[in-house]
Amino acid sequence: MKLKIDLNCDLGEAFGNYTFGGDQHILPLITSANIACGYHAGDEDVMNETVQLAKKNNISIGAHPGLPDLKGFGRRKMDLTPNEIYNLVIYQLGALSGFCKINHVKMMHVKPHGALYQMGARNKEIAHAIAQAVFDFDSNLIFVGLANTLLISEAELVGLKVASEVFADRRYEDDGQLVSRKKTDATITNTDEAIQQALKMVLENKVVSKNGKIIDLKADTICVHGDGKHALEFVTQIRNELMKEGIDIQSL
């Protein structure tokens, strides 16, 4: 059976007069867009515009809910109860769903952002609260979470279809978690290294941790990042190398 992979990217992260990333350039290269819902980034105008751009490029649309922390870009942990987590996810799904409705497109998936994503990957109660909110909002949504973590197992437990996410440009700890962005070795900046990591994850279902440990994982979707001065070249090369290996690039 021919291998396939989804390429997802976090988009719609501008806010007011502040621009972020090159969404219009990245969109034609990916298959799924995770659109910020106004808490960590994005606003009503940006959400509507990004939904329209994704529709124009025939890209699968998903919600990218985060913690209410614009200044910290949703990357700082917050001490919240599971009920507060549940409510903030519902709130953001409702916001993006409204813009999908008026543009006559369907919201297909949900991927938590930043600290919310990391908290859910390590904390069962938080993972369950996120997953339950998604299920209660729309049980047909696909839940995107870090492979081999509580995000995936709790989403499966509540009855959601899941997509295990891997990262081409992030390094992994020995336990399969992502290396914290606070550490200098968290990201892979060398394009060739990122391509080799992506190919290994898709072709072999394995990744090598920063300490050299081989970790088994399932790869349904690869996250690529649209920000940074070499982002366009980076995404283009990863896509091209995957296709050279005969891997189909298609949405979830």
Swiss-Prot record:
It catalyses: 5-oxo-L-proline + ATP + 2 H2O = L-glutamate + ADP + phosphate + H(+). CDD domains: LamB_YcsF_like. GO terms for biological process: carbohydrate metabolic process. It comes from the Bacteria. Its EC number is 3.5.2.9. Pfam families: LamB_YcsF. GO terms for molecular function: 5-oxoprolinase (ATP-hydrolyzing) activity; ATP binding. Keywords: ATP-binding, Hydrolase, Nucleotide-binding. Forms a complex composed of PxpA, PxpB and PxpC. Belongs to the LamB/PxpA family. Catalyzes the cleavage of 5-oxoproline to form L-glutamate coupled to the hydrolysis of ATP to ADP and inorganic phosphate. This is 5-oxoprolinase subunit A. The lineage of its organism: Bacteria, Bacillati, Bacillota, Bacilli, Bacillales.
